[in-house]
Design a protein with these regions (language model features):
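Catalytic-center loop of serine/cysteine hydrolases
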Residues: 43-51, 108-113, 117-217
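Short beta-strand->alpha-helix linker/helix-N-cap micro-motif
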Residues: 38, 53-127, 139-148, 167-168, ...
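Bacterial N-terminal signal peptides
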Residues: 17-29
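Pro/Ala/Gly-rich low-complexity, hydrophilic intrinsically disordered segments
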Residues: 34-60, 183-222, 229, 248-307, ...
Length: 317
């Protein structure tokens, strides 16, 4: 009995350590500079637009920007997936050593400065210029659809910014309850198109889901959106709700700790740790995905690349 209690206590502190480590990644890694759009990010966006005509495309650096996806299902309850899917892809792609990923807050600040509103949805004709402003070699975005044969169908386009060519249109489909599988399918399709060679360690790490709990993920996505709108108290509540639903969701923990570090949250850090302890003592989740993910690909041969319009054919609704 004493041994079991010791293991529980040990696991508790290990999880707290992992949460702090995840927050440190947000600070140290350029793609993890936090999820709060700061005055510095908005100032950068203003300067980028002011220098729009003088910005030169950087060569040689494998930089990718992930745009918000557009919900075209007609179901407003799926709107959190617009930023949520982009957040998940950015989180995963940022762990690939051969890639540099544009920070989500930088992308969001630029979208708002361009007058695209909180949704940050980019028209197809503006995509190449957006990529140049973000200093990206590649840019990916797309639509969230609902089809007869697939409750959720993700149709995206990967653009080579300097050449203004579509490299391919990776897709993924599934049900909302298995949204983590949909994101992983899309992720590996994008990586294949980029012709990035993954190490075995990277592949194993990328296969781990952010969360198996879709309700927790939706709360995380709602929190990010509320934070973008400057509604930090609501964001705090959504982060707490996400943590209660999935005590292993370190992204929600890190984002909540960021709000606290910036004095945007009403909850103190020690109160948050008490919350984590309470839910983790009652929670046990796996960190592996369900085997047998279905991969959907629609690759375009290098010699047959099409000019960029991003108005690519989409299966009939």
């Amino acid at each position: 009995m004493l041994h079991i209690k010791f293991l529980k206590l040990k696991n508790h502190y290990v999880r707290i350590f992992m949460s702090v480590l995840f927050l440190a990644m947000f600070i140290s890694n350029s793609a993890f500079c936090g999820q709060v759009i700061t005055d510095e990010a908005r100032q950068w966006a203003k300067q980028a637009l002011a220098q729009e005509h003088t910005i030169q495309q950087t060569d040689g650096k494998k930089t990718i920007a992930v745009l918000n996806f557009e919900n075209k299902t007609g179901m407003a309850e799926l709107n959190p997936l617009q930023k949520g899917l982009a957040f998940m892809l950015i989180t995963d792609l940022s762990t690939v050593r051969d890639l540099h990923v544009v920070e989500r807050v930088k992308m969001q600040a630029l979208m708002e400065e361009m007058g695209l509103g909180q949704s940050g949805l980019v028209e197809s004709g503006d995509t190449p210029e957006t990529g140049r402003l973000l200093g990206a070699k590649w840019i990916v975005g797309g639509d969230i659809l609902a089809l007869a044969q697939a409750p959720l169908y993700i149709h995206s386009s990967l653009l080579d910014v300097p050449d203004e060519q579509v490299l391919g249109q990776p897709t993924a489909e599934g049900i909302l309850d298995n949204f983590f599988e949909i994101e992983k399918t899309l992720l590996f399709n994008i990586i294949d198109l980029l012709k990035v060679e993954l190490t075995q360690e990277e592949r194993i790490r990328l296969e781990r889901p952010l969360s198996l709990n879709t309700k927790a993920l939706l709360d995380l996505f709602k929190a990010i959106d509320a934070s973008d709108e400057g509604n930090y108290e609501q964001a705090e509540q959504y982060y707490k709700s996400a943590i209660k639903k999935d005590a292993q969701l370190t992204a929600a923990e890190a984002n909540l700790m960021e709000l606290q570090s910036l004095d945007f949250a009403s909850t103190r850090a020690n109160e948050s740790l008490q919350l984590l302890q309470a839910v983790r003592d009652q929670t046990s989740l796996t960190d592996t995905t369900v085997p047998g993910l279905t991969t959907k690909r629609n690759l375009i041969p290098e010699g047959n690349r099409i000019p960029i319009t991003l108005d690519v054919p989409v299966p009939a609704l």
